[in-house]
C-alpha cells in the first residue's frame, strides 16, 4: 500500500471512530446531565487540568450548572458541585450512590476493606468495624485517654528538638500513627522506630503520589498506561508493602488469639473469621481483615498528620491567631492540666480554629469517587448504574454564601457575634452519608487535643517572616498536599 493509501485509510478510520463516538454520545447521553462533548478514546481529558482537577470542575460548573457529565476516556463521570447538589446525593440518595468508584492504583484492595470495597462485603465489614470501634472507645473516654497519653510522648519529642529547626512531617505524624496503631494492634512505636518511620514514609509518599497529575491520568487510563514506567509502580509497590505489613500483624494476632479476651480491633475481626470457619462464602478472610486494617492505618495516620502539619503552618502565618489560642488555653486549662475533650465546650476559639483549618485546607477536595449502584432518577436526569459520581467537597467548604471570603483563613467563619462556636452544616470535611469517614470521631478528638497540648506548652516560630509563608499546596489531586517546611517550637516557660 502506498503512503497516500495508508494516509487515506488512517483518516477514514479516524473519521469513522469520531462518527461512532458522536452516535454513542447522542444515543447514551440524552437523559444524562449536560457537559462538554467527549473526544474518542480520551474523552474530556483536554478540558481538565490534571494538576488541579477540582479547579477544572469549578469552571465546568459555572458553564453547565451544579450537575454535569464529563468523560475521562470511556469512563462516564457525573460531578455534583455546590452544597445543595452534594447534600442531595450524599444524604437523600445515599443508597443509590453508595458504591465506590474504581481506583486502579488500589487494585490490591479491590473487593476488600472499608474504603475501596463495594457490595455486601463492604457493608458488613463497615458495619462491624463501626460497632467494634465504638466498643474500643471511638469518640469516647477510651480514645480520649489514648490521645492524652500519646500527647505526653509527642510533647517529649518536641522538647528534644531544643528549640532548633525541624521538619514536622514524621515527628508530628507519630502521634496519630500511634493512636490508630494502639486501636488496631495494641502497639506503641518509639518516635525513632524504623518500622514506624518506614510506614509513615510510605503513607506520606502515597498521599503525595495520589495527588499528582500522572496518577490522575493513570487512574482513568490504566488499561493503556499500566505497562509503562511511572510513579504508579512506586505507589502500588507501597500499597502492597503496607498490606503485607498488616497481613503479618494479623497473622501474629491469629497465632496468639484468646477469644475470651480480645486485645484490640484486629482480635475482634479474627473472632468473626473463626465464626465463619465453615461458611461457603466467608466475609472475614485473612485478606479482607488485612486490607481493612491497612485502610484504617493509612487513613487514620496520614489525614490527621497532614491536617496537623498544615495547621501549624497556618498558625505561623497568622501569629495573632496563635496568640488568641494561647490566651484561651491559659485561661481555661492553665499550664499543667492535661487538655480534655470536655474543654471543647468552653474553648470556642480553639474549636473554631480547628474547624477553619480543616475547611481552609480542603484536604480531600473532590471526595473519593462514588458509584451509582442502580439506574437512578436524579432531578431531571437518569444516571445509569456504574456511573462514577463525584460529590465535590471543595464546592461546599468554599461556598462564599456560607463562608464569606472563603479563600481567606478566618476562624470567624465558625464563631457567632458573641464569640461562641457556630456549627455549619456546610462543614463536610469528612464527607457524609454511607461513605462518611469511619474515623471522623477519632480525628476530631485528635485534632483538638493534640493542637491544645502543643500550644499549651510551646510557641511556634517560623524560619521566615510570617508574611512570606506560602500556604499554597504543592500538589492538588486526591488530596491537597502542604508545602514542606521547618519550624522551631519554643517552650513557653522560656518566654
UniProtKB/Swiss-Prot annotation:
It catalyses: an organic molecule + reduced [NADPH--hemoprotein reductase] + O2 = an alcohol + oxidized [NADPH--hemoprotein reductase] + H2O + H(+); (5Z,8Z,11Z)-eicosatrienoate + reduced [NADPH--hemoprotein reductase] + O2 = 19-hydroxy-(5Z,8Z,11Z)-eicosatrienoate + oxidized [NADPH--hemoprotein reductase] + H2O + H(+); (5Z,8Z,11Z,14Z,17Z)-eicosapentaenoate + reduced [NADPH--hemoprotein reductase] + O2 = 19-hydroxy-(5Z,8Z,11Z,14Z,17Z)-eicosapentaenoate + oxidized [NADPH--hemoprotein reductase] + H2O + H(+); (4Z,7Z,10Z,13Z,16Z,19Z)-docosahexaenoate + reduced [NADPH--hemoprotein reductase] + O2 = 21-hydroxy-(4Z,7Z,10Z,13Z,16Z,19Z)-docosahexaenoate + oxidized [NADPH--hemoprotein reductase] + H2O + H(+). Substrate binds at residues 298-303. CDD domains: CYP2C-like (cd20665). It is found in: Endoplasmic reticulum membrane; Microsome membrane; Mitochondrion inner membrane. Gene3D superfamilies: Cytochrome P450 (1.10.630.10). Keywords: Endoplasmic reticulum, Fatty acid metabolism, Heme, Iron, Lipid metabolism, Membrane, Metal-binding, Microsome, Mitochondrion, Mitochondrion inner membrane, Monooxygenase, NADP, Oxidoreductase. It is an enzyme of class 1 (oxidoreductase). One of its GO terms (biological process) is epoxygenase P450 pathway. It comes from the Eukaryota. One of its GO terms (cellular component) is intracellular membrane-bounded organelle. Its cofactor is heme. Pfam families: p450 (PF00067). InterPro entries: Cyt_P450 (IPR001128), Cyt_P450_CS (IPR017972), Cyt_P450_E_grp-I (IPR002401), Cyt_P450_E_grp-I_CYP2E-like (IPR008070), Cyt_P450_sf (IPR036396), Cytochrome_P450_fam2 (IPR050182). GO terms for molecular function: arachidonate epoxygenase activity; heme binding; Hsp70 protein binding; Hsp90 protein binding; iron ion binding; oxidoreductase activity, acting on paired donors, with incorporation or reduction of molecular oxygen, reduced flavin or flavoprotein as one donor, and incorporation of one atom of oxygen. Its EC number is 1.14.14.1, 1.14.13.n7. The omega-1 hydroxylase activity is stimulated by cytochrome b5. Heme binds at residue 437. Interacts with chaperones HSP70 and HSP90; this interaction is required for initial targeting to mitochondria. Belongs to the cytochrome P450 family. A cytochrome P450 monooxygenase involved in the metabolism of fatty acids. Mechanistically, uses molecular oxygen inserting one oxygen atom into a substrate, and reducing the second into a water molecule, with two electrons provided by NADPH via cytochrome P450 reductase (NADPH--hemoprotein reductase). Catalyzes the hydroxylation of carbon-hydrogen bonds. Hydroxylates fatty acids specifically at the omega-1 position displaying the highest catalytic activity for saturated fatty acids. May be involved in the oxidative metabolism of xenobiotics. This is Cytochrome P450 2E1. The gene is CYP2E1.
